Amino acid sequence: MDSAVALSVLGAGSYGTALAISLARQGQPVLLWGHDPQQVARLQQDRCNQEFLPDVPFPDSLQMTDDLAYAVSASRDLLVVVPSHVFGEVLLRIKPFMRPDTRVAWATKGLEPEHGRLLGDVAKEILGEQIPLAVLSGPTFARELAAGMPTAIAIAGTDEQFTSDMSALMHCGKSLRVYTNPDFIGLQIGGAVKNVIAIGAGLSDGLGFGANARTALITRGLVELQRLGLSLGADAKTFMGMAGLGDLVLTCTDNQSRNRRFGLALGQGKTVEQAMTEIGQVVEGYRNTKEVHVLAARQNVEMPICEQIYQILYQGKSAQDAALALLGRDQKGE
């Protein structure tokens, strides 16, 4: 890398902190930016993220700042880890401070609010076509990643050298394996749609439908994910990898997933507001559901599971009626 700071991680939530810890544990000088000065002060004082990852101390090479200009200018390479609904806003904020050689990656999973555009398209529009871009995606829970448990993810980008550099930087033979993938579109789609299907898996379990129903939902959800991705030019093989099947299975089957827990609460009779309060963190799938609905309509792609989840979250349909609507669809070949 070209600077003393190997990477600036922008976003001090659970996942951003976990990625920063994983990198810094290898001895890499990493800078973690948070937007809240009080939170950053607590991180600096406690040398851990008491709110999200209280059992994982920060490595010595991990430093924190609330100064965005410093964080952006301190490293050639930036890793943005913020909720999808503020992704564009954060890029607008960092643009004035970017170096001539800045390269931008993100681990945000989702689509542009309201319009349902890929985050890569948002980044190109804001930062320019010439900036090297990359996206990280795959089956990763923050707590396990931060604790150094074995994890594998995928990375794709617009610039082969940047993708290779980021993969080498993040790869750790003891805990984190990073696979490069040429499918920049597919990795973005996988990370957004799996959140919606995970809500559905939680709903199914909350309704008491059992393992058969959950597995059918995951399997057909993968078909919907692939269908949307192919309409945008993605590679079908991507959806059998880390950012497709891998992330989908993880998010749909483990209660560390906020999206699954959100759906579980809804299936047990809680309102959207009550379920959100119960989770206490951003549930990306809630917004992703509307965004996927918009994108699927624009692409003229049929996504019946995602559509029923949209109707539950945004049109007041009961989970029971949504299940009946899916089961009552016309018979067809697999």
Curated annotation (Swiss-Prot):
Biological function: Catalyzes the reduction of the glycolytic intermediate dihydroxyacetone phosphate (DHAP) to sn-glycerol 3-phosphate (G3P), the key precursor for phospholipid synthesis.
InterPro entries noted in UniProt: 6-PGluconate_DH-like_C_sf (IPR008927), 6PGD_dom2 (IPR013328), G3P_DH_NAD-dep (IPR006168), G3P_DH_NAD-dep_C (IPR006109), G3P_DH_NAD-dep_N (IPR011128), NAD(P)-bd_dom_sf (IPR036291)
Taxonomic placement: Bacteria, Pseudomonadati, Pseudomonadota, Gammaproteobacteria, Aeromonadales
The protein's name: Glycerol-3-phosphate dehydrogenase [NAD(P)+]
Record's keyword annotation contains Cytoplasm: yes
Annotated sn-glycerol 3-phosphate binding sites: K109, G138, T140, K194, D247, S257, R258, N259
Gene3D superfamilies per the UniProt record, alphabetical: N-(1-d-carboxylethyl)-l-norvaline Dehydrogenase, domain 2, NAD(P)-binding Rossmann-like Domain
EC number(s) on file: 1.1.1.94
Family: Belongs to the NAD-dependent glycerol-3-phosphate dehydrogenase family.
Cellular component, GO, one term: cytosol
Active site: K194 (proton acceptor)
Catalytic class of the enzyme: oxidoreductase
GO MF entries: glycerol-3-phosphate dehydrogenase [NAD(P)+] activity; NAD binding
GO BP of this protein: carbohydrate metabolic process; glycerol-3-phosphate biosynthetic process; glycerol-3-phosphate catabolic process; glycerophospholipid biosynthetic process
Swiss-Prot/TrEMBL catalytic activity: sn-glycerol 3-phosphate + NAD(+) = dihydroxyacetone phosphate + NADH + H(+); sn-glycerol 3-phosphate + NADP(+) = dihydroxyacetone phosphate + NADPH + H(+)
Pathway: Membrane lipid metabolism; glycerophospholipid metabolism
Binding-site residues, NADPH: S14, Y15, H35, K109, A142, R258, V282, E284
Cited PROSITE patterns: NAD_G3PDH
Alphabetically ordered keywords of this record: Cytoplasm, Lipid biosynthesis, Lipid metabolism, NAD, NADP, Nucleotide-binding, Oxidoreductase, Phospholipid biosynthesis, Phospholipid metabolism
Organism: Tolumonas auensis (strain DSM 9187 / NBRC 110442 / TA 4)
